[in-house]
Every structure is written in C-alpha cells, then in structure tokens.
C-alpha cells in the first residue's frame, strides 16, 4: 500500500508451546510408555509373591521348631536313662524362633502394604526412600535368618553325632521326631533367608532403574 512492502511474517513459538510440542502433552504428568508400565507391574507382582512365600516359610520354620519336643529312654553303660528334649532347652533354637517370628511379622506387614497398593493400581515401591528402607530391612533379616540357621545347625549336628571320646551317644536315635522337626525348621529357615536375599536383589534392580 502506497508502494510500501509488507514485512514478512515471523513465526514465533512460545516456550510453553515448544515444550508441549516436544513432550506431546499440554498439561498433567507424562504417561510412561506401556512397556515400562508392564515391567513395573511385573516387578510389583514379583515382590508380592516373594513376600507371601517368605511369610509362609518363616511361619512353617517357627511352627516346626516351637513344636519340637520329645521324651524317650537311652542306654549309657548299660543303664537305661530317661531323656527329654525341647526347643527351649537350647539358646540357638530360641534364637531361631525369635528371628523367624520377626521375619514373619516383617513379611506380613510388607505383604499387606504391597497388596493394598497393588489393588489400588499404585506402585508397590512409591519412592527411592521407600526402596532403600525395604532393602535395608530385607538385608538385615536375611543375615539374621542365616545366623539363626547356622547356629541351630551346629546344635543339631552335635545331637546327631554325639561327642567323640565320650559315652554320649547319638541322641537323635531315641529322639527321632524331635530331630526331624528341628532339621525341617532349619531347612525352611535357610529357604526364608534365600527369599529375603532375592527380594533385596529386586530392590537393588529397582533402585538402579528408577
């Protein structure tokens, strides 16, 4: 108009619009990819299954040890002597019962929390602080179960072999039911330790990814 040229239009993109164009959303948090959500869901289910199995094995270990008692007779130098055995007679067995009870309580608490979050379709591990807390608890209880099982194994081995160069015989022959209960309890104790260690490894994997 009047011989003046219209200046060319300059396209200006606001920072908000640019960010929205790059992220593909205008408001609200970013939605993780479907594959990432499925992986997290699978990890959450694995945590719940591990908690349930750990609760089951620790309760079985506790029950077997708490019911381990028997009375019988044994022959020493031709004399028939009455003997009786009970889990509370040994400090190692009492330690195993206490640790198994603590692990069962820990597993039950974590199972309730995990299942409630899973039913609400929320992450079982909501934050890194929560993951570190669970990792510390799993690792501590795994070491406790390992020490309890090892201590009880030493006492059980002594009951089975007796003492060398002494008249003390194999006490597990007359007290077979007692020794079987103790052996089964120790086996479930070590299995619970393995499950807790596996759960701690899953916690480390979660921390490395998220």
Curated annotation (Swiss-Prot):
Pfam name, any one: CASP_dom
Subunit architecture: Homodimer and heterodimers.
GO cellular component: plasma membrane
Segments on the Cytoplasmic face: 1-44, 116-130, 207-210
tRNA-binding recorded as keyword: no
Family according to the record: Belongs to the Casparian strip membrane proteins (CASP) family.
Swiss-Prot/TrEMBL keywords: Cell membrane, Glycoprotein, Membrane, Transmembrane, Transmembrane helix
Residues glycosylated per entry: 159
UniProt topological domain (Extracellular) ranges: 66-94, 152-185
InterPro entries: CASP/CASPL, CASP_dom
Membrane-spanning residues: 45-65, 95-115, 131-151, 186-206
The keyword Membrane is assigned to this record: yes
Residue ranges the record marks as coiled coil: none
NCBIfam families: A_tha_TIGR01569
Subcellular location: Cell membrane
Topology of this chain in the membrane: Multi-pass membrane protein
The name this protein goes by in its record: CASP-like protein 3A1
């Amino acid at each position: 108009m009047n011989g003046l040229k219209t200046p060319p239009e300059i396209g200006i993109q606001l920072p908000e619009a640019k960010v929205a164009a790059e992220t593909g959303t205008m408001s609200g948090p970013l939605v993780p990819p479907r594959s990432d959500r499925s992986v997290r869901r699978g990890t959450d289910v694995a945590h719940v299954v591990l908690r349930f199995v750990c609760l089951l094995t620790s309760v079985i270990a506790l029950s077997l040890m708490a019911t381990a008692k028997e009375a019988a007779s044994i022959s020493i130098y031709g004399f028939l002597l009455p003997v009786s055995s009970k889990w509370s007679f040994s400090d190692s067995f009492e330690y195993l019962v206490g640790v198994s009870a603590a692990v069962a309580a820990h597993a039950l608490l974590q199972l309730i929390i995990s299942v409630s979050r899973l039913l609400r379709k929320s992450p079982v591990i909501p934050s890194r602080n929560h993951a570190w807390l669970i990792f510390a608890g799993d690792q501590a209880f795994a070491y406790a179960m390992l020490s309890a099982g090892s201590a009880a194994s030493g006492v059980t081995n002594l009951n089975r072999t007796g003492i060398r160069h002494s008249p003390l015989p194999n006490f597990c022959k007359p007290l077979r039911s007692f020794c079987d209960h103790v052996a089964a309890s120790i086996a479930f104790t070590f299995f619970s330790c393995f499950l807790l260690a596996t759960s701690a490894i899953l916690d480390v994997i979660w921390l490395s990814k998220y």
